[in-house]
Amino acid sequence: MSMNSNVYVAKLGKTVGLQGHLRLFIDSDFPEQFKKGVTFTTNRNLQLKVLEYNSSRELVKFENYEDVELAKKLTNQELYATIEQTKENCKLAKNEFFWFDLISCEVFENNLKLGTVKEIHRYPLNDYLEIITDSELVKKALPKNFLIPHIFDKFILNIDIENKRIDVINSFDILENS
């Protein structure tokens, strides 16, 4: 399975104690996906099944790695979940979307295509959509890419995942001034 069909969710740190627990550095908005019985794939293509997860101590233990020496071999590995697994285990609230669903959406303001979402960037106050500007606008000497704050009502009006379309406001001004 290619890493492109998987979603990066966490990194494993050092072992803690003698029974195979590892520090878990979660890089996901959904810590609830780390529950007993769930399987993740590592960047070394290992399949790891969660045996225990302690959210308050941020520790995880995997099946067949219940020994500190075995668990040490997992240090610094990245954990990935499949897109299907992510959708099944992570429940979204209103106006919440998976980043992988936003990537490649076309962005429109008043039916003018501004571009396509390339990436999402996390900053302390807000997330930002990185937009690759539509080629017709680049021909008019506008920047090749720009960032739109992921803030509903102020910049984002509507996100239609099924049609891969995001309608925005106040974003053409950002493009012009980028």
Curated annotation (Swiss-Prot):
For this record, the Gene Ontology CC terms, alphabetical, are:
cytoplasm; ribosome
Source species, domain of life = Bacteria
Molecular function (GO) terms for this protein are: ribosome binding
* Keywords assigned by UniProt, alphabetized: Chaperone, Cytoplasm, Ribosome biogenesis, rRNA processing
Keyword presence, rRNA processing: yes
Q: What is its main location?
A: cytoplasm
One Pfam family it belongs to = RimM
Q: Where in the cell is it found?
A: Cytoplasm
**InterPro entries listed in its UniProt record:** PRC_barrel-like_sf, PRC_RimM, RimM, RimM_N, RimM_N_sf, Transl_B-barrel_sf
Q: Which GO terms describe its biological process?
A: ribosomal small subunit biogenesis; rRNA processing
Q: Where is the PRC barrel domain?
A: 94-174
> What does the similarity note say?
Belongs to the RimM family.
Summary of subunit composition and partner proteins: Binds ribosomal protein uS19.
PANTHER family in the cross-refs = RIBOSOME MATURATION FACTOR RIMM
Q: Per its database record, what is this protein's job?
A: An accessory protein needed during the final step in the assembly of 30S ribosomal subunit, possibly for assembly of the head region. Essential for efficient processing of 16S rRNA. May be needed both before and after RbfA during the maturation of 16S rRNA. It has affinity for free ribosomal 30S subunits but not for 70S ribosomes.
Query: Domain notes, please?
Result: The PRC barrel domain binds ribosomal protein uS19.
Query: What's the protein here called?
Result: Ribosome maturation factor RimM
| Species this chain originates from | Aliarcobacter butzleri (strain RM4018) (Arcobacter butzleri)
